A protein has these predicted regions:
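Flanking helices and flexible, charged tails adjoining ferredoxin-like Fe-S electron-transfer domains
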Residues: 1-30, 38, 62-81, 86-392
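Short, contiguous, helix-prone interaction/anchoring segments in small proteins
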Residues: 39, 43-48, 52-57
Length: 392
């Protein structure tokens, strides 16, 4: 039987952590790639898709690792491969390839803006500590700093960490060439002339074999019985060499690095602005789904208050650090309760021409929304606007 030569042709396949949707045209191949691990299931792409080609999967179960399935599903035949979802994904979980090359024709033709990612580290303030890389939930910190023995057995010696110079002096008028300094330090050498019967006086010199290995520990100074040794160390810079940078495409602007930086060296603008509220009376106790799936660790279980401080109020099962929240909406999507979380986005930090398509999508994304009833089967979940919730 003859093979079909009709175009376009569509395919969808799983390749490791990626799901690849493909559209083959006569002369061009478009591919939309979803990184399953990076996708938070926030639903921005679901709402933004002009073709309504993206639907929710089992977001809570997928994000908790209970099932090995993507949090969203893309219909490869309905998808127009326009790239709008790529432009609006705060997690860079989606990418578009044209003939194997990662591109965004809709941006190239000024048909849609992109996120204006401004996060940066002031190198003059940065002391090259490890706090930002340790707290970043998105692994967006590129730390290109030499490794030393404190962090790894194979690391460089600690005395090489800072640019410095060490001066070693021996007052030969005081020195008796006893050699104790050379006994305790491998970098010091005693050169004595062989004494003869004509004179029992010792003569010679004390030298340092390798100046670069001296870490100015001053053991030789303290152990010298004649106080003949002086060691002076001059530090040229008290900063570690190397660079610590934020990788813009990976940064989700949660501000963890910014709020924990002891030198206040980090600045950034949130990708998404807005407000989010959790209503304790609607939140089911013992659930913790939103806490487990939050990509920024902004949601947490609050400490229990004494009954005397509750004043008749219901104890909250979950709390949110609004500084760390990026208003992605993943918690709203995954919440199995009704109206427990309300998200009100007010804007997206973008650069580029704000086209009619963009304005239409923004109107939808900035409509206040609340948590859905529950999730059961893929495609069954949906977000509700606040207005719909009140009318129900």
């Amino acid at each position: 039987m003859a093979m079909s030569t009709m175009f376009p042709k569509f395919s969808k396949k799983r390749e490791g952590d990626n799901v690849v949707m493909e559209q083959k045209l006569l002369q061009t191949t478009n591919s939309l790639v979803l990184d399953v691990k990076e996708c938070a299931g926030c639903g921005i792409c679901v709402e933004a898709c002009p073709e309504e080609a993206i639907t929710f999967g089992l977001v809570g179960a997928a994000r908790r690792g209970a099932i090995d399935e993507p949090a969203i599903n893309v219909d490869e035949e309905k998808c127009s491969y326009c790239g709008v979802c790529v432009c609006l994904c705060p997690f860079s979980a989606l990418s578009l390839r044209v003939d194997g090359e990662e591109r965004l024709p809709i941006v190239e033709k000024e048909g849609f803006p992109q996120f204006d990612r401004t996060a940066k580290i002031d190198d003059e303030k940065c002391v090259k500590c490890t706090i930002c890389s340790d707290v970043c939930p998105a692994d967006a910190i590129d730390r290109n700093v030499p490794e030393f023995e404190g962090a790894s057995e194979s690391g460089a010696p600690r005395q090489s960490a800072l640019k410095s110079s060490t001066a070693f002096y021996v007052d030969m008028e005081k020195c008796n060439l006893c050699g104790i300094c050379a006994v305790v330090c491998k970098d010091i050498e005693i050169q004595r002339q062989t004494p003869t019967g004509a004179s029992t006086k010792l003569e010679g010199e004390v030298t340092r074999i390798t100046e670069q290995d001296c870490d100015a520990c001053r053991v030789c100074v303290d152990i010298c019985p004649k106080e003949a040794i002086t060691v002076e160390r001059t530090v040229e810079s008290n900063r570690l060499e190397g660079t610590v940078e934020i990788m813009p495409e990976d940064c989700i602007t949660c501000t963890w690095c910014q709020v924990t930086c002891p030198e206040e060296a980090i600045t950034m603008d949130k990708l998404i602005e807005g407000e989010i509220e959790v209503y304790p009376e609607k939140c089911p106790g013992g659930c913790s789904t939103c806490i487990e799936i939050c990509p920024t660790r902004a949601l947490y279980m609050p400490e229990a208050k004494p009954a005397s401080e509750m004043a008749g109020e219901r104890e909250a099962n979950v709390a949110i650090n609004k500084d760390l929240c990026i208003k992605c909406g993943a918690c709203v999507v995954a919440c199995p309760s009704e109206d427990a979380i309300v998200l009100k986005r007010t804007g997206f930090h973008m650069k580029g021409k704000e086209t009619d398509l963009y304005k239409k999508i923004m109107e939808k994304l900035c409509t206040p929304r609340t948590s859905k009833v529950k999730e059961s089967t893929p495609g069954d979940t949906e977000l509700k606007t606040v207005g719909e919730a009140k009318a129900a």
